[in-house]
Design a protein with these regions (language model features):
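Active-site scaffold segments
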Residues: 407-461
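Surface-exposed, secretory/extracytoplasmic low-complexity segments enriched in Ser/Thr/Asn/Gly/Pro
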Residues: 2-402, 406, 453-455, 460-464
């Protein structure tokens, strides 16, 4: 019985002690809470100023002291630093600002949780400064007054048939607008270390080595210089490849690849100068067995410079690897020898005679009357080609109109045709009663030539 009473008394004592501890803790918690009615909670920061456990009534003094000691450390990309003090910019405490909102937010009964969770507040215009003094101080910053290295985009370098990426240059040029904006933000928030790089105060290259556009541009450059165009000129060839193409390429500020059209046109122009044969000197074995030196005329190869320039640009853009002939305005029948081939009309002005050969065989020959040199109407010399042929044409000129059955022009309005008004051909008629420049032929001769000739057939006109 005695043991039972002792156990009951012990349990009552334990409960009483627990109640004492609990109410003591509650009482202590309430007492501490009463303290925080007029004090800031643990880990409280306002505009960068630590006011933990500080009395509300002392806030003005705390802030004023902070401002007197305030400075902001500016760290450059290079690691160099400089300091702006609050005094230099006329920094002051705006004592007209009310802290009532913060006091209301901070529940004094939540002081325990503030031990584990910080509270940071920002009050607009808590710190004020002289904007003019700030501008003056910014203008004096070393980082704005040393030798400037401008940022530069990534670049590309041609090496052995392809392009390498040359890394961009960050430089040290500061954007004054962003610098001022960052300073105002940091000063207003009471922050004391400004890293210019982290706050993006530097001018930056638009494109870096890791930009998607950079990779795209490199691939495009490599594609362009992979082109290989081999031009055929009979037995001769001209090859255009990366060694030349890369000199025509440029990358602009937006990393767009530009092909210099003028360079391409100049290349085609040089091909034209080298391989065009219109009007060149030619040797020709005449029907009388003599060697005639021919020069002038409209016959020969002639590259279409505009068309080939455009075609070549497209080949480069597609990275083509091809063999081709250039685009031509006109072609000769051959690239070999005198290029005349074995189908042609031969006109000997001295002998006033015409021969027509087809596939190496003479089809017809006969006397003709050419232009009167004594009246300024000499028939043109050189090598030409039949432009077209027409039956029943009417030829007109100053003071004449003539109807002919067979008309085969080879130089403007100069051509070969029948002349029904003539009864004699050959000899020296052309010196007295020659044509206005055309080659007059007997009907049979004109007819046979007309029936066997094709457009583009060479016409050789020479004097012995």
């Amino acid at each position: 019985m005695k043991q039972v009473r002792i156990m009951v008394l012990s349990k009552r004592k334990i409960k009483r002690n627990l109640f004492i501890i609990l109410f003591s803790f509650i009482g202590l918690y309430l007492l501490i809470s009463l303290y925080f009615i007029n004090h800031f909670l643990f880990r409280t920061e306002i505009n960068g100023v630590n006011v933990s456990l500080k009395a509300h009534r002392n806030f003005s003094n705390i802030i004023s002291k902070y401002i007197r000691e305030y400075d902001i450390l500016i760290i450059e990309r290079s690691g160099e630093t400089e300091v702006i003090t609050g005094h230099e910019i006329g920094m002051k405490y705006n004592n007209g600002i009310s802290l009532h909102r913060i006091w209301c937010i901070q529940n004094p009964f939540m002081w325990l949780s503030s031990l584990f969770k910080s509270s940071k507040f920002y009050i607009k215009d808590l710190f004020i400064y002289n904007a003019e003094l700030l501008d003056i101080r910014i203008n004096r910053l070393n980082c704005l007054n040393r030798e400037i290295i401008n940022p530069r985009n990534v670049d590309f370098k041609y090496i052995n048939g392809s392009y390498e990426i040359i890394k961009e240059i960050d430089g040290n040029k500061i954007n004054k607008f962003y610098l001022k904006k960052a300073l105002i933000k940091y000063i207003s928030e009471g922050k004391r270390i400004l890293d210019l790089d982290k706050m993006n105060c530097y001018e930056k290259p638009k494109y870096t080595a890791s930009s998607k556009k950079t990779i795209k541009t490199k691939n495009l450059l490599d594609k362009y210089v992979s082109a290989k165009i081999t031009y055929r000129f009979g037995k001769d060839t001209e090859t255009l490849d990366a060694a030349t193409i890369h000199k025509w390429l440029k990358v602009d500020e937006n990393l767009d690849v530009i092909i210099n059209n003028n360079d391409v046109a100049a290349y085609v122009r040089e091909l034209s100068k080298k391989y065009d044969t219109v009007g060149i000197k030619r040797t020709f074995l005449t029907s009388t067995g003599k060697i005639a030196e021919l020069q002038g005329g409209l016959y020969g190869w002639k590259i279409d410079r505009n068309a080939e320039t455009e075609a070549l640009i497209n080949h480069i853009k597609k990275g083509d690897k091809i063999e081709k002939e250039p685009a031509y305005l006109q072609k000769a029948v051959s690239r070999y020898g005198n290029e005349i081939g074995d189908t042609y009309i031969e006109i000997n002005i001295t002998k006033q005679h015409l021969w027509f050969y087809k596939d190496g065989k003479m089809i017809v020959q006969g006397p003709v009357v050419t232009g009167n040199p004594n009246r300024g109407h000499a028939t043109v010399l050189g090598v030409y080609m039949i432009n077209y042929k027409q039956m029943n044409a009417t030829l007109t000129g100053p003071g004449y109109e003539a109807k002919v059955t067979y008309w085969m022009p080879f130089f403007g309005n100069i051509g070969l045709h029948d002349a029904p008004w003539r009864y004699r051909f050959g000899g020296d008629i052309y010196l007295r009663n020659g044509s206005h420049g055309c080659v007059n032929a007997p009907l049979y001769l004109a007819k046979t030539v007309f029936e066997n000739i094709e457009e583009g057939t060479p016409v050789v006109v020479y004097e012995e």
